[in-house]
């Protein structure tokens, strides 16, 4: 069975991502449930760092002037970190990666799209601050570049 896709409609155009429900069922399932519930509707990319990533998923970002943008999470709380040995997806350009607070099991609704290869964020490399990849942009990469 093919992995599901998600289409993001922005003021700069649309892009589509494949969601790795086959290898990242917890993280992908969390994202899909939030998307289907309408949680992500009307949100803005609240953190854009050129030559690094663009971040999305904070409920406070509906108002881009809200000082809390970037601090919110989903109504159900956080999810467990997912590090399956058969899913060593690297934080390559165009991949969707779960954001967290730097503590274990602190991911929830916020995720980012890598715009460069950020291998040091891969959960399977040594060091702190690990972010599991759960999808990749398959159409509209030019829109991601415009947002950046």
Label each PLM-derived region with a short phrase.
Residues 1-148:
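Cyclophilin-like peptidyl-prolyl cis-trans isomerases
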């Amino acid at each position: 069975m093919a992995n599901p896709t998600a289409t993001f409609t922005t003021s700069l155009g649309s892009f589509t991502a494949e969601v790795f429900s086959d290898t990242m069922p917890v993280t992908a399932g969390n994202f899909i449930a939030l998307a289907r519930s309408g949680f992500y509707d009307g949100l803005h990319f609240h953190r854009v760092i050129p030559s690094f990533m663009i971040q999305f998923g904070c409920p406070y970002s509906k108002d881009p002037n809200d000082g809390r943008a970037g601090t919110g999470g989903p109504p159900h709380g956080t999810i467990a970190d997912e590090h399956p040995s058969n899913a060593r997806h690297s934080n390559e350009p165009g991949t969707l990666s779960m954001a967290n607070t730097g503590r274990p099991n602190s991911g929830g609704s916020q995720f980012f799209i890598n715009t460069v290869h950020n291998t040091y964020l891969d959960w399977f490399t040594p060091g702190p601050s690990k972010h599991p990849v759960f999808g990749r942009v398959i159409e509209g990469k030019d829109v991601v570049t415009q947002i950046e």
